[in-house]
Amino acid sequence: MSIFQKIKKQIQDNIILIYMKGTPEAPSCGFSAQAVQALSFCGEKFAYVNILENPDIRSELPKYANWPTFPQLWIDGELIGGCSIILEMLENGELKKLILKVKKKYQT
């Protein structure tokens, strides 16, 4: 399986997925910490990939996503963005609304 295939599978298999530095319990950068805090505030479970333990994904995901930085939040197969977008969406209520909409979609 190529790295692009692995990334695609991770995104398909997880409704809410964040590619981050570190883990939700121990983020390794301030941006990842803020992004995880925003997601946690929304109250739904999410999956994560620690790019520090996956150097192949760390090097290839920016090409796959056409997004150069981390963290990267993916919801329902769509790239939402990085830390600043996540925080902006949290502040204006869009993040929770999107997460609830996607969760409802898969509860049938």
Curated annotation (Swiss-Prot):
Upper taxonomic lineage: Bacteria, Pseudomonadati, Pseudomonadota, Gammaproteobacteria, Enterobacterales
Sequence ranges assigned to domain Glutaredoxin in this UniProt record: 4-106
UniProt-annotated binding residues for [2Fe-2S] cluster: 29
Protein name per the record: Glutaredoxin 4
Location relative to the cell: Cytoplasm
Stored InterPro entries: Glutaredoxin, GRX_PICOT-like, Monothiol_GRX, Monothiol_GRX-rel, Thioredoxin-like_sf
PROSITE patterns: GLUTAREDOXIN_2
Domain of life (superkingdom): Bacteria
